[in-house]
Amino acid sequence: MSPTPGGVVGAGRPAQARADWMDVLRGVALIAVVLFHAGTLLRFADLQVPEGLRAVNGAAAPLRIPLLVLLSGLLMPRSVSKGVRRYARGKLAAVGYPFLLWTVLYGLVYWPGLGVEALAWLVPSLLTGGSYLWYLLFLLVFYAAALVVRHLPRLPVAAVFLVLAELAPDATKHLERPAFLFALFLGGWWLAEHPGLLRTAVRSPLAAVAAAAVLGASYALLDMSRYGPRALPGTLAGALVLAFCAHRVARSGLLRPLRFTGRNSVVFYVVHFPVIYVLMRCADLAGVEGPVLLVVVSAGAALAAGAVLALARPRSGLVRGLFTAPGRWSASGAPVAAGAVGGPPRTSP
């Protein structure tokens, strides 16, 4: 049996159907990211985050970036099977390129008014993950590190990085956080290489109930709002509960928007923040009050902008160039086919 996530649903179904549950999970994680930034960016409108949203965002922390990283790890067997050269070109095209391009675009949006002297700290900060695009930078580093450790056993290496995360100072963005997330990445990779276990985990009601109990205990006893090894039980439990639910309903017509969001995750991720930021700045200039309404409008606008661009991407080379490197840098060395919805969805985060 091929050690890929495809074995979860079972043989006999097309490859696309076998990935539906993962697309749903990515969609859920992306919407959680959008809501988080719609709340945190209220500060640019001189407004406070509503307590209810603050609580929701805190509870959803393990369902945002950690879930996306875990899912990226699940796709590793398929990625590395392409060979080192195609693997590297694909990741640079689908992750490295949008990171650099949107770092520049975001810098152009954020920089006006700061003055030329601000460039001395702004440029290095942005290029080292000092913006919302840090996730893409970290993911690119994880893909590079995966080549180094690809011949080593996954779980022992993951354990080493969990120890490093525990030893690192708490809440350090470039120490504790990447070590913890890379451990999750390796854990997802290991699961993908054990399709029987993965199949059982996402199908078993008993496993889902046990995971829900662990998740509840984690929320009650641990700080789940931070990326660190102490959040590992709750993070894995939350991912399992969501995977169980997604697996059962993934092909529902009602979830088509979530699947679409998940398949085009890189588009929604890079687009949402600038849209929300600009709207918050405009709201501040207009003296708009009402944080709840502003969160709803800005999050809705960000998702709408992402949807429009995701729909346009397979039809427009110009739009496609906003998210994927030119064809000669792609994994196959050829431009993305115009009829491929969302381009190469399995290489996006």
Residues of each region from the PLM?
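Aromatic-anchored segments of alpha-helical transmembrane domains
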Residues: 31-38, 102-104, 159-173, 210-223, ...
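Alpha-helical transmembrane segments and terminal signal-anchor/GPI-anchor hydrophobic tails
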Residues: 197-259, 274, 281-282, 289-292
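Specific transmembrane alpha-helix
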Residues: 65-78, 135-147, 174-200, 232-252, ...
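Interfacial loop-to-helix transition and helix-capping segments at the boundaries
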Residues: 53-65, 123-137, 168-185, 199-202, ...
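Juxtamembrane "helix-exit" motif on the non-cytosolic side of transmembrane helices
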Residues: 42-46, 111-116, 168-171, 218-225, ...
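Membrane-interface junctions at the ends of membrane-embedded or membrane-associated helices
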Residues: 15-16, 79-86, 150-153, 192-205, ...
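Hydrophobic core of alpha-helical transmembrane segments in multi-pass integral membrane proteins
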Residues: 158-168, 207-221, 239-245, 296-312
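Membrane-cytosol interface segments of multi-pass membrane proteins
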Residues: 1-161, 286-349
